[in-house]
Amino acid sequence: MKKLLTLSIIAFCLAACGSNNTENKKTTASEPPSPESANPSYDPKRGEGKFSKVEVSPTLETAKADAGEKVYSVKCSSCHKLSEEKLVGPGWKGVTSRHTAEWIMNFSTNTDEMLNKDPKAQAMLEICLVRMPNQNLSDDEARN
């Protein structure tokens, strides 16, 4: 249970305004090109940022879970719930099944670039209508 809580906290720190919106949208000539076509090196599974490989332990790391819970309480809980319920941003339940650890870490620490380039982040922004503010998370805070 603590592992799930920890992963959920990490995921929601990174995926602040996320949604599992699978609605297909047609591209028109007036829309900007997708990040993949504009930047062939862009990896939508990884996102935009410095994290390219994040190792996730198969067992719960209690110290990280406790630290992550503190970060969530101070910087995330005013906008995000640990359930599916949307507050200002989306609920965090299931975020690790929708996004990779790398994507979550990059979103948490590089929010503006992700919102500018990532189609999933842009779709979340359309639903939430509020850009997630930069929380100035350290790498360790984002990882916990």
Regions found by a protein language model. Give the residues of each.
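Short pre-active-site segment immediately N-terminal to redox-active cysteine/selenocysteine motifs
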Residues: 64, 72-75, 83, 131, ...
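Gly/Gly-Pro-rich "capping" loops immediately C-terminal to redox-active cysteine motifs
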Residues: 65, 80-110
